[in-house]
Amino acid sequence: MFNTHPLSITNVAGLNDALGAPVINGTCTTCHDAPNVGNHSRPVPLDIGTSHAGSYESDAHVLAALGQLTVPDLPVYQVTCTGGPLAGTVRYTSDPGRALISGKCADLGRIKGPILRGLAARAPYFHNGAAATLTEVVEFYNQRFQMGLTNQEKADLVAFLKSL
């Protein structure tokens, strides 16, 4: 499944635009491949939506994926972009991410993904600790990236992640 289940990721803000690819076709190993074992999964910080504030989210796919992930104790930052193509845009996030370093509004929420090795021992998941289990992580990605995994494929993926 991990090398053969085809995925087409389109219109995912923070991913397709960050990589300059309107469509990303591949499999799980397109990003989580052997050269990246032991390192961050991708060398580029990406915004996959885990730090978005659900009550302010306008992207239906992010909102659906965030529905299960709530961390009420985290502050929500309101950021008004002052320069570049996002000037005047107001964004809400629980983790400013790379923007704290770069000062760029486009970097809000962008983070480097952690390595997958030893994942089962590192709960809770995501930078904000919003997912308590690997099942919640898999469900988030399945909804966020419209992967279309069956219940059996999700269970298989969780079992695989636990084995790393």
Where are the model-predicted features located?
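Loop/turn elements at helix/coil->beta-strand transitions in domains of secreted/extracellular proteins
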Residues: N25-G26, E153-D156, L164
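Short, well-ordered loop/turn and helix-capping segments at boundaries between secondary-structure elements
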Residues: A121-R122, F140-Q143, S163
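Long, low-charge, small-residue-enriched segments that form tightly packed helices used
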Residues: R144-N151, L161
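Extracytoplasmic/secreted proteins, especially bacterial periplasmic and envelope-associated proteins
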Residues: A13, T133-E136, Q152, D156-A159
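Short glycine/threonine-rich turn/loop motifs
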Residues: M1-A130, E136, M147
